[in-house]
Amino acid sequence: MKLCADILYWRLKEKLTTVTQRGKGGSALTLNRPEFYLDRSQSFEKNRVYVCSADHLPQSPKLGENVCLICLGQHWNLSAYYDRCSVILVEGNWDIFRVFNLVQEIFNRYDSWEDQLWTILRHGGNLPQMLEASRGIFENPMLLIGSDFRYLGVTEEDYLRNKLGLQLDTQSFD
């Protein structure tokens, strides 16, 4: 599954305390799995995530569209990237291999979710099953409403009923 810089940023922020996002963010799901940036390379391919050390970045890079750099540390040249791509800064004393593995885990999590949804769809599952499979991704109560404003499925029904006061037994917003 392809992801976006915003998802990567928020999921990394859950694990690492010193993460900030700069440059072009975005919610379009265009980014492929990460790769390590190899020193001396001047070009960054479009729709790619690169995990790198900020002090190893080139001064005059060729940046494709929708590039996301996950940079460890700061460097004076880094501000030149902010107008041209998404930059997720990881400050502090983090191991580059650990950060790379965390990014891989984020992609694995979303790939697993996509696989679950396809399995449910292929085996004639229903919408409540899809909602249940999505709970770990959205991490909030969900309410699926049809075009006729009837409830098609809910998660955490007790929360919706007791905390938000929704009367789910009427099957609509009447």
Question: What is each model feature region?
Answer:
Residues 1-174:
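Alpha-helical/coil-rich non-catalytic "connector" segments in signaling and regulatory proteins
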